[in-house]
Amino acid sequence: MSYITKQDKVIAEAIEREFQRQNSNIELIASENFVSEAVMEAQGSVLTNKYAEGYPGRRYYGGCEFVDVTESIAIDRAKALFGAEHVNVQPHSGSQANMAVYLVALGMGDTVLGMNLSHGGHLTHGAPVNFSGKFYNFVEYGVDKDTERINYDEVRKLALEHKPKLIVAGASAYSRTIDFKKFKEIADEVNAKLMVDMAHIAGLVAAGLHPNPVEYADFVTTTTHKTLRGPRGGMILCKEEYKKDIDKTIFPGIQGGPLEHVIAAKAVAFGEALENNFKTYQQQVVKNAKVLAEALINEGFRIVSGGTDNHLVAVDVKGSIGLTGKEAEETLDSVGITCNKNTIPFDQEKPFVTSGIRLGTPAATTRGFDEKAFEEVAKIISLALKNSKDEEKLQQAKERVAKLTAEYPLYQ
């Protein structure tokens, strides 16, 4: 920070205040995590200076011999993590990765089967406001109204009816194990390709705690942050037969120069994920999520689908205590707990209001929170949300958050 402080005090102050916010708040946004100092150092390195259009050994610029090394290592480590035949580590984001797959697998206006956003899907899985919904004819599948789990019979029925060219599996707010084998069987039945967006569960997959979609899917996309605990970015894993098409669609198709400093940080994160303690970490992520869900149930909250198999807990706050997701998010933020409002299946509220909140355990687990800590987190959440207009109770919740975060300091 010393260089930034000398050059730009306003930015330095904003960064410092953001660090203090992260350190003093309990981070429960399911898509966020805390990267290691090594990942941050790689991302802030001199590699940010280097242009390297093309791929290792096939660049349009000179002086790429060392970024060739870092990018090749990132590719090899990703292959080792997931057992993929081919990996492209250049996508700037998960959305860019998804766009590239769509451009390879589809023509404009082709029919695609994707998960309904309000049931747990993602914007890039066919939301009308997103490029995916504008360029392609997405047909939505969802969860069963009673179980709130993916209804595979409905997926099959829709596939047989609409004959999609591509089926997209994966979600941004779904707390149960996804059966990729079933998706593959359905795709094969209608002669469709299968794409899996594993952005939220990639870390669990790498640790062997969730079925690996690489075995079944033609294309697998992911972000490199979230549970994978790397820098913000994207990645595509695919069969060897799609290597050429995927690579030329990323560059020169939809991107120019790759962010080699970010790719180096991806390589570092993948190296960390190959270590034994990464599996231990992911096991704790899942344990903590299960404890959080159970503790909230004991406090009287309804958990979507009745629990969780992964890192994520979806809470029906409107149905439980009458607060909207927006109100719950704001109340928790006021006491130092960060989460996000989220639609729940069959939600009657607008997307900016919602009936639910989405909670995740990866970030707090990274800083050391265990089951006991998450039992306390659930009690604080309950105290705050049930007393959202009581300043005395909210102050008590705030003090309990401060005590908990002090026990598990960030970057110490």
Curated annotation (Swiss-Prot):
GO biological process, one term: tetrahydrofolate interconversion
Enzyme Commission number: 2.1.2.1
Annotated keywords: Amino-acid biosynthesis, Cytoplasm, One-carbon metabolism, Pyridoxal phosphate, Transferase
Family annotation (InterPro entries): PyrdxlP-dep_Trfase, PyrdxlP-dep_Trfase_major, PyrdxlP-dep_Trfase_small, Ser_HO-MeTrfase, Ser_HO-MeTrfase-like, Ser_HO-MeTrfase_PLP_BS, SHMT-like_dom
Domain of life assignment: Bacteria
Localization (cell): Cytoplasm
Sites where the protein binds (6S)-5,6,7,8-tetrahydrofolate: L117, G121, H122, L123
Reaction(s) the record says it catalyses: (6R)-5,10-methylene-5,6,7,8-tetrahydrofolate + glycine + H2O = (6S)-5,6,7,8-tetrahydrofolate + L-serine
Pathway of action: One-carbon metabolism; tetrahydrofolate interconversion; Amino-acid biosynthesis; glycine biosynthesis; glycine from L-serine: step 1/1
Family: Belongs to the SHMT family.
Enzyme class: transferase
Annotated Gene Ontology cellular component terms: cytosol
A Pfam family per the record: SHMT
Subunit composition and interactions: Homodimer.
Co-factor(s): pyridoxal 5'-phosphate
Function: Catalyzes the reversible interconversion of serine and glycine with tetrahydrofolate (THF) serving as the one-carbon carrier. This reaction serves as the major source of one-carbon groups required for the biosynthesis of purines, thymidylate, methionine, and other important biomolecules. Also exhibits THF-independent aldolase activity toward beta-hydroxyamino acids, producing glycine and aldehydes, via a retro-aldol mechanism.
Cited SUPFAM superfamilies: PLP-dependent transferases
A molecular function (GO) term: glycine hydroxymethyltransferase activity
Residue list for modification N6-(pyridoxal phosphate)lysine: K226
Protein name: Serine hydroxymethyltransferase
Record site feature (Plays an important role in substrate specificity), residues: H225
